Protein backbone atom coordinates (compact mmCIF):
# COMPACT_ATOMS: atom_id res chain seq x y z
CA UNK A 1 0.00 0.00 0.00
CA UNK A 2 1.11 3.54 -0.69
CA UNK A 3 0.31 6.92 0.75
CA UNK A 4 0.24 9.84 -1.66
CA UNK A 5 0.58 13.48 -0.74
CA UNK A 6 0.23 16.20 -3.35
CA UNK A 7 2.12 19.34 -2.28
CA UNK A 8 3.76 22.13 -4.22
CA UNK A 9 2.58 20.55 -7.48
CA UNK A 10 4.80 17.65 -6.47
CA UNK A 11 3.42 14.22 -5.70
CA UNK A 12 5.06 12.50 -2.76
CA UNK A 13 4.38 8.78 -2.83
CA UNK A 14 5.41 6.79 0.24
CA UNK A 15 5.17 3.12 1.06
CA UNK A 16 2.83 2.48 3.98
CA UNK A 17 2.76 -0.82 5.85
CA UNK A 18 -0.03 -0.41 8.43
CA UNK A 19 0.85 -3.57 10.39
CA UNK A 20 4.55 -2.75 10.73
CA UNK A 21 5.83 -1.56 14.10
CA UNK A 22 6.88 2.07 14.23
CA UNK A 23 10.65 2.51 14.21
CA UNK A 24 12.69 3.69 17.16
CA UNK A 25 14.58 6.97 17.32
CA UNK A 26 18.33 6.72 17.16
CA UNK A 27 21.34 6.89 14.88
CA UNK A 28 20.46 6.35 11.24
CA UNK A 29 16.77 7.21 11.52
CA UNK A 30 14.95 10.09 9.85
CA UNK A 31 13.81 12.74 12.32
CA UNK A 32 11.97 14.84 9.76
CA UNK A 33 11.85 15.86 6.12
CA UNK A 34 11.62 19.60 5.45
CA UNK A 35 10.08 21.30 2.44
CA UNK A 36 10.78 24.93 1.62
CA UNK A 37 8.04 27.39 0.64
CA UNK A 38 8.40 30.99 -0.50
CA UNK A 39 6.39 32.76 2.20
CA UNK A 40 3.65 32.62 4.84
CA UNK A 41 0.88 32.91 2.24
CA UNK A 42 2.13 29.85 0.36
CA UNK A 43 2.46 28.01 3.67
CA UNK A 44 -1.14 28.88 4.65
CA UNK A 45 -2.39 27.51 1.30
CA UNK A 46 -0.58 24.23 1.94
CA UNK A 47 -1.88 24.13 5.51
CA UNK A 48 -5.42 24.38 4.17
CA UNK A 49 -4.79 21.61 1.61
CA UNK A 50 -3.40 19.35 4.32
CA UNK A 51 -6.30 20.00 6.70
CA UNK A 52 -8.84 19.56 3.88
CA UNK A 53 -7.26 16.15 3.22
CA UNK A 54 -7.72 15.21 6.89
CA UNK A 55 -4.15 15.64 8.14
CA UNK A 56 -3.43 16.77 11.68
CA UNK A 57 -1.13 19.79 11.25
CA UNK A 58 0.49 21.91 13.96
CA UNK A 59 -0.05 25.61 14.27
CA UNK A 60 2.68 27.80 12.79
CA UNK A 61 5.89 27.71 14.84
CA UNK A 62 8.08 30.82 14.75
CA UNK A 63 11.65 29.50 14.47
CA UNK A 64 13.13 33.02 14.41
CA UNK A 65 14.70 32.50 10.95
CA UNK A 66 11.69 30.81 9.34
CA UNK A 67 8.13 29.72 10.14
CA UNK A 68 7.26 26.03 10.27
CA UNK A 69 4.28 23.69 10.20
CA UNK A 70 4.58 19.99 11.04
CA UNK A 71 2.57 16.86 10.30
CA UNK A 72 3.25 13.11 10.22
CA UNK A 73 2.78 10.52 7.52
CA UNK A 74 1.09 7.19 8.39
CA UNK A 75 4.50 5.68 9.22
CA UNK A 76 5.21 8.40 11.79
CA UNK A 77 7.78 10.38 9.78
CA UNK A 78 7.57 14.06 10.65
CA UNK A 79 7.25 16.50 7.72
CA UNK A 80 8.03 20.21 8.00
CA UNK A 81 6.81 23.02 5.74
CA UNK A 82 9.25 25.93 6.30
CA UNK A 83 9.16 29.46 4.87
CA UNK A 84 12.12 31.36 3.43
CA UNK A 85 11.40 34.60 5.35
CA UNK A 86 12.39 36.13 7.62
CA UNK A 87 15.69 34.51 6.65
CA UNK A 88 19.14 34.26 8.18
CA UNK A 89 20.07 37.86 7.37
CA UNK A 90 17.49 39.46 9.63
CA UNK A 91 19.90 39.62 12.59
CA UNK A 92 23.39 39.61 11.03
CA UNK A 93 25.10 40.66 7.80
CA UNK A 94 26.40 38.38 5.06
CA UNK A 95 29.96 39.08 6.21
CA UNK A 96 29.11 38.01 9.77
CA UNK A 97 27.19 34.82 8.91
CA UNK A 98 28.60 31.86 10.78
CA UNK A 99 31.11 33.81 12.87
CA UNK A 100 29.08 33.46 16.08
CA UNK A 101 26.45 31.06 17.34
CA UNK A 102 23.08 32.74 16.84
CA UNK A 103 20.36 31.40 19.11
CA UNK A 104 16.64 32.12 19.03
CA UNK A 105 15.33 34.31 21.86
CA UNK A 106 13.89 31.37 23.82
CA UNK A 107 17.37 29.79 24.11
CA UNK A 108 19.38 32.92 24.94
CA UNK A 109 19.20 32.31 28.69
CA UNK A 110 20.63 28.80 28.14
CA UNK A 111 23.54 29.91 25.91
CA UNK A 112 26.25 28.51 28.23
CA UNK A 113 24.51 25.13 28.39
CA UNK A 114 24.05 24.96 24.60
CA UNK A 115 27.63 26.01 23.83
CA UNK A 116 29.02 23.48 26.34
CA UNK A 117 27.46 20.66 24.27
CA UNK A 118 29.12 21.74 21.01
CA UNK A 119 32.42 20.34 19.82
CA UNK A 120 35.13 22.84 18.92
CA UNK A 121 35.51 23.38 15.17
CA UNK A 122 38.66 24.77 13.60
CA UNK A 123 38.46 26.29 10.16
Residue ranges with predicted function:
Residues 58-62:
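Conserved S-adenosyl-L-methionine
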Residues 2-56, 72-123:
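Glyoxalase I/VOC metalloenzyme domain signal
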Amino acid sequence: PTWALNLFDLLIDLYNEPNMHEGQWGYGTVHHVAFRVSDDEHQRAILQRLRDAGHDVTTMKDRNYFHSLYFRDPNGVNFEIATDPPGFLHDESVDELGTTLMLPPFLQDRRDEVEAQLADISV
